[in-house]
Amino acid sequence: MRNDEGFANLIYEYFVVRFHFQYYKYGDSLPKIDTLCRQFSVSSLTIKSALKRLQEDGYIHRCHGRSAQVLFRQSDRELDDYAVRFFSKRRAMIPDLYQSTELVVLPMMVKSLCQMDEQDFAVLTRLAEQPDPEDQMRFFCYILQKVQNPLVMNLFWESTLYLGLPFPMENKGHRLYDDGTSQRRLRELIAAGRAKNPARIYEAHLAFQRDVSKQILSYINARIPEQPDIETLPFVWKVYRDRPEICGNLAIRVIHDVYLGDFRDMEFLPSYEKLAGKYGVSVSTMRRTIGVLNQLGATQSINGKGTRILMLSDSETGQTPDLTVPKIRRNMAYYLQSFELLADSCKGVMRMALQTFSDAQRTELADLLKGYLQNKRYYISPQSIFAFVAEHSLLQVIQEIYGKLYGLNLWGYPMAKYRKEMPKDILVEHGYEPEDLSSSPSFSLLSTEEAARFFQE
């Protein structure tokens, strides 16, 4: 179980939205702490931190030994105003979000269901038969938890929070869900999982998701008036939540510039002062960032000479990454988790992207990859493809998700030269085998036939 203050803030926001939509009303009891721990895959300390903040802000009352009780009240007019503001900001983005998460999260769902045993399916069957929309959330949480990838769980909850799910079954006599249809779709999904049939799982989940999204959009379009003056709220994947990693994000930008940007043909980085000017940060922040890169083994600070770039060098330096540093281990965990998400989703995302790119964009990408082959820098082709998709995809949410995954995945690239020295425990503790890093589907985004067609067109 994770103990994460940033996730506590997500849980806080999750319940605030639930209160405003009257999913939980005045006098209702919240689920017990152990239930919430299982639902969010976090420790009791994280849940208690979220509940403490809800109590301090007057949303709930807590009494030792009893479930928290809802104190929040609002008038019907306040509910209507909140719903109009909430959905008017998101209406245009909802189809994009559903399509994007279908491409990224659904492959993980398929993999999870194929790993389940009969005991797991018994749990899912019990959840599927419950009419409460909250149990549908627990249904999909239980599935995703099977792959033990905190990053996909984070993405699931962030997208759920953006959509305001789950909604109450009814609002003012208007039914949002057909629970009979939903239960039938979930039973079909369980049957496909029992059969270990990835294609059936994919289609069953897609049918459920499209039913729900159609019902939600139909309700919004029928009940929420258009607000032309309200700007669309973009989906932002808050991987770090309220714990901004300034040096971490800056280190990712430096690694990007070494592989794909201004520093790719340099032996030494520019001075701290020049780097600070380029990235718009203080010199002290830049020094701390280089310190992180030194600990990673990506760079080496040499007195009187500057900061040497090691990540592209094949020569022996006597320097190895310090994987005992908590920040480095955390970022390596993000690398492994993003690696899995990219490996499982890249085929579908790339197929969609190639179909929607303009002729000029397809030519630009082809020329980029041909250039890497000619100058023998083909090892960065996957990263350049991910970056290209993050910049040019027609789906805003894919731009956001792949932009974040690209950055997190960069943490692993400087490790290539140290792969033999990487301790096995950092892999095993995240559910991977050491050979996983050298046999990734990310390096075969397209089949040979697809690649040939791409370059011929």
Regions found by a protein language model. Name each.
Residues 4-13, 32, 66-83, 247, ...:
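Short, cationic-aromatic polyanion-contact patches
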Residues 1-20, 26, 87-189:
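Ordered, small/hydrophobic-rich secondary-structure cores
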Residues 22, 27, 115-119, 128-134, ...:
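Short helix-adjacent coil turns
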Residues 118-168, 204-212, 356-414:
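Conserved amphipathic alpha-helical segments that form helical-bundle/coiled-coil interaction surfaces
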Residues 74-110, 160-161, 313-352, 404-407:
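Conserved segment of winged-helix/HTH DNA-binding domains
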Residues 1-38, 223-269, 330:
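Extreme N-terminal segment that seeds HTH/winged-HTH DNA-binding domains in transcriptional regulators
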Residues 17, 22-70, 258-309:
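N-terminal helix-turn-helix
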Residues 172-241, 255, 415-457:
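C-terminal all-alpha effector/ligand-binding and dimerization domain
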